[in-house]
Amino acid sequence: MTPTLAPSSRVQLTDSGKLRHFLTTEHLPRSLLEDILDTAASFVDVGGRAIKKVPLLRGKTVVNLFFESSTRTRSTFELAAQRLSADVLNLDIAKSATSKGETLLDTLRNLEAMAADMFVVRHQDSGAPFFIANEVTPNVAVINAGDGRHAHPTQAMLDMYTIRHYKGGFEGLKVAIVGDILHSRVARSQVHALNILGADEVRLIGPKTLLPVDAEALGATVFTDMAQGLKDVDVVIMLRLQKERMDSALLPSEAEFFRLYGLNNDKLLFAKEDAIVMHPGPINRGVEIASEVADGPRSVILNQVTFGIAVRMAVMSMAISGQDSDMSAAGGAHGQR
């Protein structure tokens, strides 16, 4: 896993402590993470209304900058922005000027000239959203939609929302994160968020070849045995094998991985009877999770997707609000770029 890329609380927060950018869960105050969850709770029912919109970002422009493909994540960000009444621009990186030699910085400057208010950034390189946040003008918010192996903070927060929804809080909870921890930006963000929110214990379970050397330094207990790692946990979060990021030598075979670390009903018996099962998606059935579990009564995977829209609405609205208040405090007029 990648080390901290910047003093993240200073980059992400306004002088008054409001959200300015959302780049990582690391080092953020507990009160802010709880504010995100509380704000998301107010948006959950929007999807069930006849008119699925609130006017909080009316007149704002959100640009999705996805340098790494992800239909699911981009779609939920797009839907979240639309439900906030924002205008949304999806930049096709493969056909954009960046693929023709224009630098990332030049692309940003051109988008800023179009009066963009927010960039949602997904990039294959760790740290790219930090770079963008440091380069944009003060009235543009940046949301990290996943960067390299480093962080995926909105995924972590929708997972935190799901846990709080089903468990009522975090105190006393034992949470197991299972699978390809080494390549998972989601796992890193989850560990930070769980520790900040007061979980009793965070466990990382996987083969030694797929566990980062700094796992315990993150504030997690490491297990290589599923029976020991799942014993009496309240939440099981399964992660997919990121074969596109790994050397084949790290994994004997998918069948062997499933035998040892795939979650089926037999292995789930080691967890508490009321333990919930989560997965950030996409799911590889028969590799990290059996269909009997993914589709079973303890699975809350589909609800994670539903909650994800509300959480991203919360983050986007809070970041824009923080930017606007920061500009007002500085005496600047929003729109001067």
From Swiss-Prot:
Q: Which positions in this protein are listed as binding carbamoyl phosphate?
A: 72-73, 122, 152, 155, 281-282
What InterPro entries does its record include? Answer: Asp/Orn_carbamoyltranf_P-bd, Asp/Orn_carbamoylTrfase, Asp/Orn_carbamoylTrfase_sf, Asp_carbamoyltransf, Asp_carbamoyltransf_Asp/Orn-bd
Q: Which residues bind L-aspartate?
A: 100, 185, 240
Q: Name one Pfam family in it.
A: OTCace
List, alphabetically, the SUPFAM superfamilies matched: Aspartate/ornithine carbamoyltransferase
EC number(s) per UniProt? 2.1.3.2
Any one GO molecular-function label of the UniProt entry = amino acid binding
Q: Does the keyword Transferase apply?
A: yes
Report keywords, A-Z: Pyrimidine biosynthesis, Transferase
Q: Name one GO biological process term.
A: 'de novo' pyrimidine nucleobase biosynthetic process
Oligomeric state and interaction partners are given as:
Heterododecamer (2C3:3R2) of six catalytic PyrB chains organized as two trimers (C3), and six regulatory PyrI chains organized as three dimers (R2).
Q: What is this protein called?
A: Aspartate carbamoyltransferase catalytic subunit
Native organism is Alcanivorax borkumensis (strain ATCC 700651 / DSM 11573 / NCIMB 13689 / SK2)
Question: Gene encoding it?
Answer: pyrB
